[in-house]
Curated annotation (Swiss-Prot):
GO biological processes: protein quality control for misfolded or incompletely synthesized proteins; rescue of stalled ribosome
Annotated catalysed reactions: an N-acyl-L-alpha-aminoacyl-tRNA + H2O = an N-acyl-L-amino acid + a tRNA + H(+)
Disulfide bonding pattern of the chain: none
Naturally occurring in which organism (per UniProt): Francisella tularensis subsp. novicida (strain U112)
Marked site positions, Discriminates between blocked and unblocked aminoacyl-tRNA: 12
Site (Stabilizes the basic form of H active site to accept a proton): 95
Record flagged with keyword Manganese: no
Catalytic residue list: 22 (proton acceptor)
Keyword entries, A-Z: Cytoplasm, Hydrolase, RNA-binding, tRNA-binding
Top enzyme category: hydrolase
Name this polypeptide is given: Peptidyl-tRNA hydrolase
Length: 191
């Protein structure tokens, strides 16, 4: 059975994007690093900011691509190749429009669902056989509003809900790392 060796937090690089809904993946890995007293260092060769942590006695690389969302797969594939990490050993954390704020879901494989970061990762890895932790940000109501919505900051109430979802996901990280997926899915997917 595989174990997770890399956690990718999707988002866009730059202060103007740091607090936007599209960067909730980055928020997630930043919280893991903070909880483990680690900081990220820039790795231009691998097109990312990297931190290394130990989760339940497993060495895990935290990756924040510095390529912008639409080319996240470049960094993911470079890091995976450098550390010899298989797609099944990767957890990608990202924003999800089709899930309410405060909700979080775990998924293995599947399509990109219009998410450009996932599309890029699928293309660069040549597979969609990796785990995803989908953090709900809610939907603006009409597809014409999506681009502005994901690139804007959440309300204070929505930010609290998203932070709560992140904390909830981190509570299950040991089991996710060790591929104990069924109990995690059962708990996360039950209201």
């Amino acid at each position: 059975m595989p174990k997770i060796k890399m956690i990718v937090g999707l988002g866009n690089i730059g202060k103007e994007y740091q607090d936007t809904r599209h960067n909730v993946g980055e928020w997630f890995i930043a919280k893991i690093a903070q909880d483990n007293n680690q900081s990220f260092s820039s790795n231009p060769k691998l097109n990312c900011n990297l931190a290394k942590v130990s989760i339940d006695y497993n060495n895990v690389v935290l990756v924040f691509p510095t390529t912008y969302m639409n080319n996240s797969g470049l960094a993911v594939s470079k890091v995976a190749n450098f550390y010899k990490i298989a797609p099944a050993e990767i957890l990608v954390v990202h924003d999800e429009l089709d899930i309410d704020s405060g909700e979080i879901r775990l998924k293995k494989g599947g399509g990109h669902g219009g998410h450009n970061g996932l599309r890029s990762i699928n293309q660069h890895l040549g597979t969609n056989d990796y785990l995803r932790l989908r953090i709900g940000i809610g939907h603006p109501g009409h597809k014409s509003k999506v681009a502005n919505y994901v690139l804007s900051n959440p309300s204070i109430a929505q930010k609290k809900d998203i932070d709560s979802a992140i904390d909830n996901g981190i509570c299950f990280l040991d089991d996710i790392i060790n591929y104990k997926l069924e109990p995690v899915m059962q708990k996360l997917h039950t209201k």
